A protein has these predicted regions:
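Extracellular glycan-modifying ectodomains
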Residues: 1-141
Length: 141
């Protein structure tokens, strides 16, 4: 498949988007939304804020059910693959932050070129007419 995009970047919802891009040879680097569960409005807000507070510990909440899972309460993101349940957050946050800083900087640099964004549209949250809230947001913006 020939395309005119320099980059094809996952905007997430869940990990499978990046996995499928990789499976078909369309993913050339790791980006911030690849391996997490992400709220679409949170993704847009995070990009507009240039990833400020992405891993700010003030907004990180550890799951009671699975101690490896953390939620960013500002952007409504869930990190499932980055943390070790046997270490306290403060001992592992620097390493995770460095990884996401590289990915965020790569993202902001990459989107200056021709970029195709791919996102799985969640239908888990619907309005009273049974239409996906994410799809409505996209249509309205």
């Amino acid at each position: 498949m020939e395309n005119s995009y320099k980059n094809i970047i996952s905007l997430g919802y869940f990990c499978e988007v990046a996995g499928e891009l990789e499976k078909y040879g369309l993913r050339n680097a790791s980006f911030p939304f690849d391996w997490m569960i992400s709220d679409f409005e949170g993704v847009i807000s995070c990009i507009k804020n240039e990833f400020k507070d992405f891993l700010n510990p003030t907004y990180l909440s550890q799951s009671c059910n699975d101690r490896t899972h953390y939620k960013n309460t500002k952007y409504n993101f869930y990190f499932f693959h980055d943390f070790d349940k046997y270490q306290p957050l403060h001992k592992q946050l620097r390493k995770v932050t460095e990884k996401y800083k590289r990915r965020s900087e790569r993202f902001l640099k990459s989107i200056k070129s021709e970029t195709l964004f791919v996102r799985y549209i969640s239908d888990e949250i619907k309005n009273e007419n049974e239409k996906s809230i994410e799809l409505l947001w996209i249509e309205e913006n």
